[in-house]
Amino acid sequence: SHFFEYLINTSRIYWRKEMEYAFDGNLNAMSKYHAQHPFDIEGVSLTPEEIKEQKANLINKIFTFGYMMHHFKSPERAWAPMAMDNKIGEENECNGRSGKSFFFKVLSILMKTVKLSGRNPKLMDNPHVFDQVNQHTQLLLLDDCDRYLNTGLFYDNITSDMTVNPKNNQSFTIPFEDSPKLAFTTNYVPSDFDPSSEARLIYMVFSDYYHQKTEDNDYLETRTIR
């Protein structure tokens, strides 16, 4: 499927070695190879270790997609995906446009979703932050999270009941088994890799196979999902 092809390419973290560096600037050879290997997780010039890493990256995405789609929830296996870019720029910031949001856009078509902007690091200071959530919500997506957003404040909502405090209405609690699964996307390297975070988050890494060429980078072209 086209979606599986997308998953493969967002897992090709060594695509530049495979598709550019191996041809020493020969654009015709690059183009020919790309046409022959548009969705190849086992690049010809990659080492066994690099191929293994790319396959693990792909399996991680497949597992995460299946986990999010499954409506059964277990307190012992309650996780939230944290999607980030593999390529890190200055000040631990990524350029984005790697396809992270598309992963959850597909999920949002299949799941009843509430999306909140994670750009506000004080998001959880709002007592009505979950105002849009109800017992029918299946996915709560915190998109484009700020580097200073404390994801630890959401951990109780990942592993237990969720309390919703709507504006001008009475608060209510959604039992864990009926509460939405959470997910995060960010353009920054998470600052917390403590045991508590690792027990609750599924880290997802997206390659820069899909990218935008600008004056500030050395990409040869712009490559998009479409």
Task: Kindly give the residue locations of the regions a language model identified.
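Conserved catalytic/switch belt of AAA+ P-loop NTPases
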Residues: K112, N150-I174
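Conserved nucleotide-binding/hydrolysis micro-motifs of P-loop NTPases
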Residues: I88, D146-R147, N187-S191, S207-Q212
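P-loop NTPase catalytic core of nucleic-acid-dependent motor ATPases
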Residues: S1-N134
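Structural recognition of the conserved hydrophobic beta-strand(s) that form the central parallel beta-sheet
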Residues: L139-D143, E177-N187, M204
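Signature of the SF2 helicase/ATPase Hel1-core->accessory helical subdomain module
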Residues: Y155-M162, A183, L201-D208
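Phosphate-sensing "switch" segment of ASCE/P-loop ATPases
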Residues: F176-S179, D194-R226
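AAA+/SF3 P-loop NTPase mechanochemical coupling elements
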Residues: H128-Q135, P166-T185
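Conserved AAA+/SF3 P-loop NTPase catalytic/coupling segment centered on the Walker-B
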Residues: H136-T159, S191-E198
